[in-house]
Amino acid sequence: MIGGICPTCGLPKELCICEEVAKEQQRINVKVNKRRYGKEVTVIEGLDPTDIDLEDLSKFMKGKLACGGTVKGNSIELQGNHRDRVKELLSLKGYSTENIS
């Protein structure tokens, strides 16, 4: 097979829906923290790194928001206050808006 088999569900990679199911079930918390010198940082928590590639999601967010950021542990940190836009972008990526707070 070209794509291989998903280790979670056992289906071929082309038919695997594990990531979509994981997106619907996660409770995501978006908050803004103040750092040194009054700088604001948007923190996205509650993402499971085993089901979703946080680096790819972080890269997508940084590109759309035109800001810097990083992945720390199970969270994504973005420079600046982007709380409202992050919720919109997460819904575009397939996350349920009811599970984003």
UniProtKB/Swiss-Prot annotation:
GO terms for biological process: formation of translation preinitiation complex; regulation of translation; translation reinitiation. Signal peptide: none annotated. It comes from the Archaea. It holds the Pfam family SUI1. PROSITE patterns: SUI1. Gene3D superfamilies: SUI1-like domain. One of its GO terms (molecular function) is mRNA binding. Keywords: Protein biosynthesis, Translation regulation. Belongs to the SUI1 family. HAMAP family: SUI1. PANTHER family: DENSITY-REGULATED PROTEIN (PTHR12789:SF0), DENSITY-REGULATED PROTEIN HOMOLOG (PTHR12789). NCBIfam families: PRK00939.1, SUI1_rel. This is Protein translation factor SUI1 homolog.
